[in-house]
Amino acid sequence: MALYAMGDLHLSFSTPEKSQERFGKIWKDHEWKAKKNIEKLVRPDDTLVLTGDHSWANNLVQCQRDLEFIEALPGRKILLRGNHDHFWKANQTEKLNEMFKGKLRFLQNNFYTYRDYALVGSKGFCFEGPFFIDTRTNLITGYDKAAYEQSVKLVDREMKRLITGIDAAKAAGYTKYIIFLH
């Protein structure tokens, strides 16, 4: 019963115009290469946490083939929401868990277990601002207060989601945690 994590599959079976190949030839057939490597490593009784950016799809209908691809991977699959997972609305986690019960598990505002650990996670948020940096000199040349305030809101929201999962795990008696961030 091993625990594995990987992220950023960026599948596009129903959205070929968003194929990763647009970023270069190295991405050709990346999904099949990932599948082959996962199948070499992950066994049916292992847990595979997919840490976000599963699909380029904009909605659940478009995402169906991508999720079927993930379902077919070995192991117990736990999916964390990434910044490109537009098919997964923040208030849909429970609905997704019902729809894919026994096949996929969606991790947001909740927890799953691995041995005596609670698995919790959030997509987190990373931002480059609010400072403007001159790349030639590495000196700060400006500041965007609105960008800073928006970033603080996003970081706070994701932190609350993470804490909700930790609190649920604590209430269930867990004292050890593995935290995943996209």
Language-model regions, residue ranges each:
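Preference for well-ordered, secondary-structure-rich cores of eukaryotic proteins
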Residues: 102, 107, 115, 126, ...
